[in-house]
UniProtKB/Swiss-Prot annotation:
It catalyses: [phosphatase 2A protein]-C-terminal L-leucine methyl ester + H2O = [phosphatase 2A protein]-C-terminal L-leucine + methanol + H(+). This is Protein phosphatase methylesterase 1. It comes from the Eukaryota. Residues 114-365 form the AB hydrolase-1 domain. One of its GO terms (molecular function) is protein C-terminal methylesterase activity. The lineage of its organism: Eukaryota, Fungi, Dikarya, Ascomycota, Saccharomycotina. Its EC number is 3.1.1.89. SUPFAM superfamilies: alpha/beta-Hydrolases. It comes from Saccharomyces cerevisiae (strain ATCC 204508 / S288c) (Baker's yeast). One of its GO terms (cellular component) is mitochondrial small ribosomal subunit. PANTHER family: PROTEIN PHOSPHATASE METHYLESTERASE 1, PROTEIN PHOSPHATASE METHYLESTERASE-1 RELATED. Demethylates proteins that have been reversibly carboxymethylated. Demethylates the phosphatase PP2A catalytic subunits PPH21 and PPH22. Forms inactive complexes (PP2Ai) with phosphatase PP2A-like catalytic subunits. Involved in the regulation of cell cycle progression at START.
């Protein structure tokens, strides 16, 4: 092969590579400009790979800082929910901070109203689901209900007796959740026509475990209203292994920031929140102000460490065996454990993977999560299917 021919081939290959790189960087630039979660196809989303922003790694210094105007106008709970209520649960010695939006309109051609009830994971809060709740309400045009709350030891939920022994094992969280569900059902949900209510429990991480194990403890009346249970980014085997790394994570996670905006910036910098619009409502709920003007993290996960080994035990087996419809949404390439693999092969639950989301699926991909939940509700609720028949409407033509 002549040198001239080799040179032409090399130049041609270089030009093709340059075009690919240019297109890739342009796509990444447009993605960052949009700063949202692009839609993929159901039931599995295999869109663009994770987008990594460039950060300096220093608190408060990032190429994605919010402006002074934005800092003075962070969103509040009322931008996402219609109501905020402090619910007293004397049997649990708790005053639980709750957020909810009730159905505002009904469909004439359906007999089902979906009620989405959310349970957050450890170290989070009910406002982790704020963007998701808003998307659900928007897409269903007010024809749904959304309930979220702060679990014990989190955000604005308080113990009635500050000096009482505090337990953070799974069973305690479950009893809280069951008590709160009973309150919601009697005071809010049952006000809707009962034949129309289809309740879907959605739990992120630890919340998924709590939803799974709470179901058998619900009253028979309430169990009949549970259409399905959804777990967000939780696999028993992986979760138990991850607990061994929590100490290292906590050592590298600041508990005090100069301001709430610095806290938001830090979580976005470190990709703990990949969608700023979600971070701006979810992160402030995790901090309380100090007299110095700084903010401190409300939940100290180190105090939970004696109870970690109770959180995920037997989760996969119990989830697969639930007698209701089940949905598991995972982020990235999370591997299934044996129980989930067998259950998936047997068609025991629906599996959806968001390749471009971080661990906080409801925050990083609220649009796709909303679409997936709506699809899950529609495909599993037989009351949404109206079968019309012409049986008996046609006269029989007899031969003459």
């Amino acid at each position: 092969m002549s040198d001239d021919l080799r040179r032409k081939i090399a130049l041609s290959q270089f030009e093709r590579a340059k075009n690919v790189l240019d297109a890739t960087f342009q796509e990444a630039y447009e993605d960052d400009e949009n700063d949202g979660d692009a839609l993929g196809s159901l039931p599995s989303f295999n869109g663009q790979s994770n987008r990594n922003r460039k950060y300096t790694g220093k608190t408060g210094s990032t190429t994605d800082r919010i402006s002074s105007k934005e800092k003075s106008s962070l969103p509040t709970w009322s931008d996402f929910f219609d109501n905020k209520e402090l619910v007293s649960l004397p049997d649990r010695d708790l005053d639980v901070n709750t957020y909810y939006t009730l159905p505002t309109s009904l469909l004439s051609n359906t007999t089902s109203i979906p009620i989405f009830i959310f349970h957050h994971g450890a170290g989070s809060s009910g406002l982790s689901f704020a963007n998701l709740a808003k998307e659900l309400n928007t897409k269903l045009e007010g024809r749904c209900g959304c309930f979220a709350f702060d679990a014990r030891g989190h955000a604005e939920t308080k113990f009635k007796k500050a000096d009482a022994p505090i337990c953070f094992d799974r069973d305690s969280f479950i009893k809280d959740f069951v008590s709160l569900l009973n309150y919601w059902f009697k005071s809010k949900i049952s006000q809707e026509p009962l034949q129309k209510v289809s309740v879907i429990l959605i739990g992120h991480s630890l919340g998924g475990s709590i939803c799974t194990f709470a179901y058998p403890k619900l009253s028979t009346e309430l169990q009949k209203k549970i259409l399905g249970i959804t777990m967000l980014d939780i696999v028993e085997e992986a979760a138990i292994m991850a607990l061994n790394k929590v100490e290292h994570f906590l050592q590298n996670t600041p508990n005090v920031f100069e301001s709430i905006n610095d806290a938001v910036d830090w979580h976005v910098q470190h990709a703990l929140s990949r969608l700023r619009s979600s971070a701006e409502i979810a992160i402030p709920a995790l901090f309380a102000p100090l007299k110095s003007g700084k903010v401190v993290r409300i939940t100290n996960l180190k105090t939970f460490s004696p109870f970690w080994d109770t959180w995920f035990t037997d989760l996969s087996h119990s989830f697969v065996g639930l007698p209701v419809s089940k949905l598991l949404i995972l982020a990235g390439n999370e591997n299934l454990d044996k129980e989930l693999i067998v259950g998936q092969m047997q068609g025991k639950y629906q599996l959806v993977v968001f390749q471009d989301s971080g661990h906080f699926i409801q925050e990083d991909s609220p649009i796709k999560t909303a679409i997936t939940l709506i699809d899950f509700w529609k495909r599993n609720d037989s009351r949404n299917v109206v079968i019309k028949t012409n049986w008996g409407q046609h006269k029989t033509v007899q031969n003459t």
